[in-house]
Amino acid sequence: MKKFALIVGIVALAIFSFLYIQLYRVQSAINEQLAQQNIAVQSINLSLFSPALSLENIKTTQFSAQKIEAKFSFLPLLYGNAALHSLNIQQLKLTQNTQNPANVSIEISPFSLKQLLSKKVILNGENHIRIEFNKPIYGKTKTFHFSFHKANLDFSTSESTPLQFVDASLNNQPIGYIETHTAHQQIVTYIKPQCDNDCLAVLKYQQIDNQSAVNFSGKYFPVQRLFALLNLPEMLSGHADFDLDFSFSSSSLIQGKLNFLAQNGEILGVNLLDMVAQYFPINYNNDLLQNKELNTRFEQFYLQLFLQQNQLIAEKIELKTPALLGQGKGIIDLNRMECNVDINLNSTDQRYQNLTLPINFFGNCNSPQYKINFTKKFRHQLIDAIKEKLR
């Protein structure tokens, strides 16, 4: 029995010694790469029982981090092949004065560390990246989930680094193919989702010192997918042309604006025709009212939005449907996802263009309540419209 225990002990010691040697080789390879890239690290630590390598207080010309921990698969390490399967980055800062650092966790299909340190990297299988900022970027949004099934990363040139992602998703929304190019202080990303017609979105990021700017624009992009990506309430369907600008100082959002034009979609959870039919002296045909218990079909829906602290200010709202025209403005509270919108509706029928119905929508943006503002002006307009119809 003692001999058996001794043999087991010797085998275990041999295994852990071998693991230590493999991890030490990994550490040496990483040290070499750190020196080549001029990356300063306070300390590097090894862990055997859950094979891992951790770096403390990392500083480069491009970013800094409190800690980076790389975890390796156990079995491949026994065969002398260090295979990385997860990477955790604590308190990542893109500039020294960043006031809103992020924690990043990366889970990838195990692959050889030799490949990771090469000029070109190919990732296959399920891969997940989770980014959580210390403070919300806007509203309650501070966490982003990114996943993909395949990636090609090319670091062979210092001037431009192309990154390609296939079957990608952001915040559980499929966004298809992504191609990113980095050059100097600018990053340009092209997003090509699967859609009925040609649709494309372009994300541009530029940083100068502590100031950074993001421009996100698109053509014929699926509206519901766009709102989900931005963590906005799901209010519309259809396809949209949009242009969004964000400005940051030390990673804190200071300004944002959005111009948005959706076409051939629906306002979800609200039927304006059903509301208007109670007050407008208009006869609607069956085609217009066939979805009266569901949504409002529109031909065009235009929004001009500004971000002010945790509120989206809708400075201009313009709506065009086969039967109605609308203009308005409002506020969206991003913390509570509550809306307060005033919109004035007119009929497309020229006989009733002087009749304007003022409606106020309020409460939960996904299922808002409404009230008709029966002003003295509206009552006079309604009486005149009824008289006109009875002539």
Swiss-Prot record:
Protein name: Uncharacterized protein HI_0134
Topology in membrane: Single-pass membrane protein
Tagged with keyword Membrane: yes
Alphabetized UniProt keyword annotations: Membrane, Transmembrane, Transmembrane helix
Transmembrane segments: 4-24
Cysteine pairs bridged by disulfides in the record: none
UniProt xrefs under PANTHER family: DUF748 DOMAIN-CONTAINING PROTEIN
GO CC annotations, alphabetized: membrane
Protein's cellular compartments: Membrane
Tagged with keyword RNA-binding: no
UniProt-listed InterPro entries: AsmA-related
